[in-house]
């Protein structure tokens, strides 16, 4: 194998080509590789942050759901209590109204009973006077004996 000038010329050209590539071609390629590496790292970081954010959002959504369920249960409990209270108030109002109607009816019955008793006393007094007239066969003075009849009616 002979080393001749062509081989040396080719070696020099090759070294010049390598130096040229290292000086002008290699830096943009390295910069592109670093930029691509940075984009990939940023993408992985963003994915990691997104996964953490997703976990936090799911946890927060679960917490809000639990709070909403608890609040709904509390509202339902309050509604049940209010419903029971309304029913109790209605029962109490109905009982008071029934007592009032009962008392009013009792008073009306008492009043009518007293009226009937007074009417019966008056009729009894009149019957007693008529009976005494028939027994005695003579007319009895109504004015003179009205006081006697009233006393008799009051005793009855």
Swiss-Prot record:
TM spans (from-to): 12-32
Any GO MF annotation of the entry: proton-transporting ATPase activity, rotational mechanism
Major subcellular site: membrane
Subcellular location: Cell inner membrane
Residue ranges that the Swiss-Prot or TrEMBL entry lists as coiled coil: none
Membrane topology according to the record: Single-pass membrane protein
The protein's role, per its UniProt record: F(1)F(0) ATP synthase produces ATP from ADP in the presence of a proton or sodium gradient. F-type ATPases consist of two structural domains, F(1) containing the extramembraneous catalytic core and F(0) containing the membrane proton channel, linked together by a central stalk and a peripheral stalk. During catalysis, ATP synthesis in the catalytic domain of F(1) is coupled via a rotary mechanism of the central stalk subunits to proton translocation.
Complex formation: F-type ATPases have 2 components, F(1) - the catalytic core - and F(0) - the membrane proton channel. F(1) has five subunits: alpha(3), beta(3), gamma(1), delta(1), epsilon(1). F(0) has three main subunits: a(1), b(2) and c(10-14). The alpha and beta chains form an alternating ring which encloses part of the gamma chain. F(1) is attached to F(0) by a central stalk formed by the gamma and epsilon chains, while a peripheral stalk is formed by the delta and b chains.
Protein name: ATP synthase subunit b
UniProt organism field: Pseudomonas savastanoi pv. phaseolicola (strain 1448A / Race 6) (Pseudomonas syringae pv. phaseolicola (strain 1448A / Race 6))
């Amino acid at each position: 194998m002979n080393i001749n000038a062509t081989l040396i010329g080719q070696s020099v050209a090759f070294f010049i080509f390598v130096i040229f590539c290292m000086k002008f071609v290699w830096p943009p390629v390295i910069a592109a590789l670093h930029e691509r590496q940075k984009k990939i790292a940023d993408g992985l970081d963003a994915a990691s942050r997104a996964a953490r954010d997703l976990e936090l959002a799911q946890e927060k959504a679960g917490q809000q759901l639990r709070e909403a369920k608890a609040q709904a249960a509390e509202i339902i409990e309050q509604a049940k209590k209010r419903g029971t209270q309304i029913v109790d108030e209605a029962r109490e109002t109905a009982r008071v109204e029934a007592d009032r109607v009962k008392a009013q009816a009792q008073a009306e019955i008492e009043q009518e009973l007293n009226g009937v008793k007074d009417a019966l006393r008056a009729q009894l007094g009149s019957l007693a006077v008529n009976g005494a007239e028939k027994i005695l066969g003579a007319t009895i003075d109504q004015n003179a004996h009205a006081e006697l009849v009233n006393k008799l009616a009051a005793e009855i």
